[in-house]
């Protein structure tokens, strides 16, 4: 409730608010002229004669300690109870208040305060008689009326249903009643039977539930075993893949090894180890030049290395054939290889030289080269024993220490260095290497092709 004061007219304006939307209300002018009779009619609760009898109402009021009330019968069958004015005026209310302000005289202020108090008490009584708090604005009242209309329609429909049921019951005779009793007994028996079936079903349900728990436990165990088997399978699968990779790797290695083996089988050890060729006027073995020219002074270390490879080649060919040389024994010793005389073992014939003045006066180097030529001749003769068609391109004269160019110029070239030119000595060495190359080819064809 709100209040405002106007100082010119010395009047007080008081307004109430809606109990739902809290909007300020402007009361109707009829609230200003309320008399006691009107107030009693507005605040009296509505009861029908069927719901409450006068005697019972009076007895209840007497027992409850309430003040007596006046019941006024009406033509519409509704009794109205009126609360005595003295009680209403003395009721303490939540809307009660004391008006303090200025007025033209004391009587007017007292009348205004009394009227507002009566109005507030009236709203409290109306709120106590119903489930709705008062006052309400017009919109909230319309909403409330719509709700009450809905409840009224529902209640009327229920009432109509009850009336129809009552009419049906009143129209039924005794036979129908007995028949209904029999049906009721049958339904009771059916209910007992269904209850028994329900109990049996409940027992079966418990049994099925127990079986279900067992099956679920078994299923869980099987799931665990399946997971374990899956893990083992995955591990075995991984191992299988690793073994497959290893197998493929081994197979690849075997194929590669087989290819290498086939290649090695086709490879001639002598041809691969001893490569005899020529470089200009020089005969070469494993890229070492054998001989020297005035225009090309080959180092003696290279010549000695070439002689070492040559001795090693003839020694290997003889061992392959099982040939043992007469008069001399080959001793491969790198660039210090030599021949050992079988008649005089203390005599060594070196196939190496350092040059200088000593080279011209010491003839051991020449004797060693002639002895080596003798060994080549023995190798040729050994081959001819088994292969009569075998022939070397250059004929060798061991006694003179010369090699003849039978297929070319027909000249003879000494293998010695003393009293010989470097050109002829180099050519003789070249022809000797050519004969060894032919011997190498024959040995390869006889032993390795088989």
Curated annotation (Swiss-Prot):
Disordered as annotated region, ranges: 48-72
GO biological process, one term: positive regulation of autophagy
Region of interest (Interaction with BCL2 and BCL2L1), ranges: 112-159
Domain of life of the source: Eukaryota
Keywords: Acetylation, Antiviral defense, Apoptosis, Autophagy, Cell cycle, Cell division, Coiled coil, Cytoplasm, Cytoplasmic vesicle, Endoplasmic reticulum, Endosome, Golgi apparatus, Isopeptide bond, Membrane, Mitochondrion, Nucleus, Phosphoprotein, Ubl conjugation
Modified residues (Phosphoserine): 15, 30, 90, 93, 96
Positions bearing N-acetylmethionine: 1
Function: Plays a central role in autophagy. Acts as a core subunit of the PI3K complex that mediates formation of phosphatidylinositol 3-phosphate; different complex forms are believed to play a role in multiple membrane trafficking pathways: PI3KC3-C1 is involved in initiation of autophagosomes and PI3KC3-C2 in maturation of autophagosomes and endocytosis. Involved in regulation of degradative endocytic trafficking and required for the abscission step in cytokinesis, probably in the context of PI3KC3-C2. Essential for the formation of PI3KC3-C2 but not PI3KC3-C1 PI3K complex forms. Beclin-1-C 35 kDa localized to mitochondria can promote apoptosis; it induces the mitochondrial translocation of BAX and the release of proapoptotic factors.
Subunit: A homodimeric form is proposed to exist; this metastable form readily transits to ATG14- or UVRAG-containing complexes with BECN1:UVRAG being more stable than BECN1:ATG14. Component of the PI3K (PI3KC3/PI3K-III/class III phosphatidylinositol 3-kinase) complex the core of which is composed of the catalytic subunit PIK3C3, the regulatory subunit PIK3R4 and BECN1 associating with additional regulatory/auxiliary subunits to form alternative complex forms.
Stated name of the protein: Beclin-1
Lineage: Eukaryota, Metazoa, Chordata, Craniata, Vertebrata
Gene name per UniProt: BECN1
């Amino acid at each position: 409730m709100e209040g405002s004061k106007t100082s010119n007219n010395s009047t007080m304006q008081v307004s109430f608010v809606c109990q739902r939307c809290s909007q300020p209300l402007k009361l109707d002018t009829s609230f200003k002229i309320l008399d006691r009779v009107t107030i009693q009619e507005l605040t009296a609760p509505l009861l029908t004669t069927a719901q409450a009898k006068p005697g019972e109402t009076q007895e209840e009021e007497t027992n409850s300690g309430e003040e007596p009330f006046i019941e006024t019968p009406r033509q519409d069958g509704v009794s109205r109870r009126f609360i005595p004015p003295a009680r209403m005026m003395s009721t303490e209310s939540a809307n009660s208040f004391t008006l303090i302000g200025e007025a033209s005289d004391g009587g007017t202020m007292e009348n205004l305060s009394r009227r507002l108090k009566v109005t507030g008490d009236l709203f409290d009584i109306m709120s106590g008689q119903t489930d709705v708090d008062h006052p309400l604005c017009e919109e909230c009242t319309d909403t409330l009326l719509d709700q009450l209309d809905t409840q009224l329609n529902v209640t009327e429909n229920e009432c109509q249903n009850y009336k129809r049921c009552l009419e049906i019951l009143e129209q039924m005779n005794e036979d129908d009643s007995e028949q209904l009793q029999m049906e009721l007994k049958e339904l009771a028996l059916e209910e007992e039977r269904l209850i028994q079936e329900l109990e049996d079903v409940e027992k079966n349900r418990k049994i099925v539930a127990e079986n279900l728990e067992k099956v679920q436990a078994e299923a869980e165990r099987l799931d665990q075993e399946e997971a374990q088997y899956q893990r083992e399978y995955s591990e075995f699968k991984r191992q299988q893949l690793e073994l497959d990779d290893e197998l493929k790797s081994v197979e690849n290695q075997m194929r590669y090894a087989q290819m290498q083996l086939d290649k090695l089988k086709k490879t001639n050890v002598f041809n691969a180890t001893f490569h005899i060729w020529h470089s200009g006027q020089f005969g070469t073995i494993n890229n070492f030049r054998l001989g020297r020219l005035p225009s090309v002074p080959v180092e003696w270390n290279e010549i000695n290395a070439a002689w070492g490879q040559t001795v090693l080649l003839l020694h290997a060919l003889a061992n392959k054939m099982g040939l043992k040389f007469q008069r001399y024994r080959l001793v491969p010793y790198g660039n210090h290889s030599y021949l050992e005389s079988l008649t005089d073992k203390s005599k060594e014939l070196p196939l190496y030289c350092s040059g200088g003045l000593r080279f011209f006066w010491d003839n051991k180097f020449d004797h060693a080269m002639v002895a080596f030529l003798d060994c080549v001749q023995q190798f040729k003769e050994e081959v001819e024993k088994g292969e009569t068609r075998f022939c070397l391109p250059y004929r060798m004269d061991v006694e003179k220490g010369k090699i003849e160019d039978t297929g070319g110029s027909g000249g003879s070239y000494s293998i010695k260095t003393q009293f010989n030119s470097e050109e002829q000595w180099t050519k003789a060495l070249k022809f000797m290497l050519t004969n060894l190359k032919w011997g190498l080819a024959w040995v390869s064809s006889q032993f390795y092709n088989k």
